[in-house]
Amino acid sequence: MADTQVVIVGAGQAGLAVAYYLRRFELTPGADFVILDRGPGTGGAWQHRWDALRLGSAHHVNDLPGMSELGLSFDTADRTLPAKDIVAGYYRRYEDHFGLQVQRPITVSRVFDRGADLVVAHDQGETRTRIVVNATGTWGAPFVPWYPGMADFAGRHLHTSSYSSAEELAGQSVVVVGGGTSAIGFLLELEGVAGELTWATRRPVDFRDESELTIEGGVAAVAAQDAAARAGQALPSIVSGTGVPRTRRIAAGIDRGLLVERGMFARIESDGVVWDDGSKTRADAIIWATGFRPELRHLAPLKLREKAGGLTVASGASWQDSRIFLAGYGPQASTIGANRAGRVIARQIMAQL
């Protein structure tokens, strides 16, 4: 017999959105459904973001469904405070207001079959359930591409997930790798703090003026994510479809020569990186702003991954196992996508119960 009807793994924007709608459909938090979250506190991945990130400089954060009942909105939040603190605080009040009873910190290690049910194994035991909603996002699966000599580097390898503040790199020579907004944010923050900055990208950065940032372009990028998910393919990056907005701050950085990419280095040596032409740049640290992959290792026993590299998912539901839903996967990864998907997934769950 199942311990609960639904287990939601992850209490970020996607997990909380599903929980909100399950509660609206009169399921009881902590009984009919339980939420297991690995984080030490509220906020999902936001609680781990770097100190200098502000809501005004981050991708737009949409409100969770029902947040207006608390009189809260990220649109009116204080943009002088760290984004990590604002999001964590708002999510804490949200969980309390709706009585979601999130259990944390609990780390899920695997999900497997037991008869007709699923078992969610975690560091505090096992929970047997009829349905699992995976809402683990990507923060726990940072992606760092391999380059020759990586293991020989005597300096520090940092990733977006481990970067804390510019001060820890004061006076050092830093190479930032990546062509997205995180890489640009690091360069802007490190300017005047690091001793020397170099920007490495695999391809030229696609800067776009505001007039080029259309709704159609955003819809097309999300559609590409959806098509890949439905085909069971590895998910493309969003920035590859939308480009990077040329804001005033970014345009100024380009004009003064800060935001000028050099291309990609060929290999890494103990004290720096070597380029295709044989020239070398000394480095004390390399920041890999190279993105994340969906965190799905705990689902491996269910053998959902396709040969094409992804999971076959449509409207948040696994095509291979009707008991598995993936909130925040592919086209649902943004905050607005996660909110809409929460309602869609909750309705499908109710149809099964």
Language model features with spans:
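Short, basic/glycine-rich phosphate-binding loops at helix/coil junctions
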Residues: 63-73, 228-233
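Short glycine/proline- and charge-enriched loop/turn segments
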Residues: 68-74, 154, 306
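Redox-cofactor-proximal catalytic regions of oxidoreductases
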Residues: 41-70
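Flavin (primarily FAD) cofactor-binding/catalytic cores of flavoenzymes
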Residues: 2-40, 44-47, 52, 79-353
